[in-house]
């Protein structure tokens, strides 16, 4: 469920192909996201999942899986 919501957001916000987004997808290397893209994406994720993502935490996210695990942990 978390992964699907993240994929939908990335497809809509960043005009990405959902097939290109997996747990192992790297934000910078595979998708070419810059820091502004990442910040905008995380702000939307905070709204959708009602979680808080600090700047330090954001910088530690390298893959989609990192985000999924963080959100799942903070939803519990």
Swiss-Prot record:
PTM annotation (O-(pantetheine 4'-phosphoryl)serine): residues: 35
The UniProt record lists the keyword Cytoplasm: yes
UniProt subcellular location: Cytoplasm
Biological or metabolic pathway of the protein: Lipid metabolism; fatty acid biosynthesis
Any single biological process term in GO: lipid A biosynthetic process
Record's keyword terms, sorted: Cytoplasm, Fatty acid biosynthesis, Fatty acid metabolism, Lipid biosynthesis, Lipid metabolism, Phosphopantetheine, Phosphoprotein
Modification comment: 4'-phosphopantetheine is transferred from CoA to a specific serine of apo-ACP by AcpS. This modification is essential for activity because fatty acids are bound in thioester linkage to the sulfhydryl of the prosthetic group.
GO MF entry, a single one: acyl binding
PROSITE patterns: CARRIER
Gene3D superfamilies hit by this protein: ACP-like
Domain (Carrier): residue spans on this chain: 1-75
Recorded GO CC terms: cytosol; membrane
Function: Carrier of the growing fatty acid chain in fatty acid biosynthesis.
Similarity comment text for this entry: Belongs to the acyl carrier protein (ACP) family.
Protein name per the record: Acyl carrier protein
Gene this chain is encoded by: acpP
């Amino acid at each position: 469920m978390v992964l699907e919501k993240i994929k939908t957001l990335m497809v809509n916000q960043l005009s990405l192909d959902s097939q290109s987004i997996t747990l192992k997808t790297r934000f910078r290397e595979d998708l070419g996201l810059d820091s502004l893209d990442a910040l905008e994406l995380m702000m939307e994720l905070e709204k959708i999942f009602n979680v808080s993502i600090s700047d330090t935490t954001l910088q530690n996210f390298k893959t989609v899986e990192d985000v999924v695990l963080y959100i799942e942990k903070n939803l519990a």
